[in-house]
Every structure is written in structure tokens, then in C-alpha cells.
Amino acid sequence: MEFVDLIQSRRSVRGYSAAIPHDDLVALLTRAQQAPSWKNLQASRCYAVESPEALAALRVQGLPSFNQNSSTGATLVVTTYVRDLVGFTQGQPDNEVGNGWGAYDLGLHDAYLVLAAADMGYDTLIMGIRDAEVIRKLLDIPENEAIMSVIAVGKRAEAPAPRPRKPLDEVTRFI
């Protein structure tokens, strides 16, 4: 698929008929690792949840009901970044953004993940409304990692309609 077609056709899917198989998940996460990062520090981390028991616990305990329903049938990938690494030198922030750079790099990683999934024929839903501390305990995520999102990955049950985009002149200023 051409890249322009890929970015224009990718949708957030809220209903899944099948999870991504393990080997495809490994390939997907390997592709997501190719995302650029500050000084190549690669502070993004993934927790791929595949077992039925872990998926059920994560959905019921870590997600609100609307996200539980939206992600049923999919594999879940929790994405985090290592705090105080990206955008820091000798423990001090390089500028006012500080840990925002870790979140920025993770955003790049997650964009690569969802676009690579689409290229592989899978659909995704990035969920930011979640209970981070419950997820931390369930998946044994270290305290030095900031939990950002839970991403559902699988085959869509039905095709969602395209969502409108704001006009370019509303979000861009040419100088």
C-alpha cells in the first residue's frame, strides 16, 4: 500500500473479530522499534498482553467499560516510556519540556506501531483513558516508566466511517 493511502485509510476501530497472531505481533513491535528517538535512547517500552486471563484482567480492572467493549477480541499492547532519560543530561532536563520528550518519542513509536499494523492488515485503537496504577500492578511495570496508552490490535469486525479533519488553514500557519 502506498504511504499516503495508508495514512488516509487508517481508522480507530472499536470492534474486533480476531486478535493479532503472536508471530505477526513480534513483527509489528519490531517495526515500531524503528521509530526515531532522542539521541537514539529508545526509551519506549511495550507490554504485549496475549493470554486470555491477562487480557480479561487488564480489560476489566484497567479500562473503563467503553474501552473494555471497544477492545474485546483484540490483543492489547501497553506502551510506556522510561522517565528522566529522554530530554535529560546527567539527571537534569535539557529544556523546559523535560519528560515531555519521552512522551513525544513514545508518540512517534505509537504512530509507527499503528501505521505498521495497518500496513500488515491489522487495525488498532489507542486508548488513553485507563487506570495506570492498576495496569502497573497487573503487568509489573517498573515505577520509573510512565504508562501512556493501551493499544488494541486485531482484525476489525466492521469498517468504521472516515472521521472529518479540520481544514489545513485552521491548524497551520505559513510564515
What would you call each of these model-derived segments?
Residues 32-33, 77, 94-138:
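Small-aliphatic-rich amphipathic alpha-helix that forms the alpha element of a beta-alpha
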Residues 81, 129, 155:
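Short secondary-structure boundary segments
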Residues 20, 50-53, 130:
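Short beta->alpha linker loops
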Residues 37-106:
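Glycine/small-residue-rich phosphate/adenosyl-binding loop
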Residues 3-12, 17, 90, 149-175:
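C-terminal helix-cap and adjacent tail motif
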Residues 17-23:
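A short beta-loop-alpha structural element at the N-terminal edge
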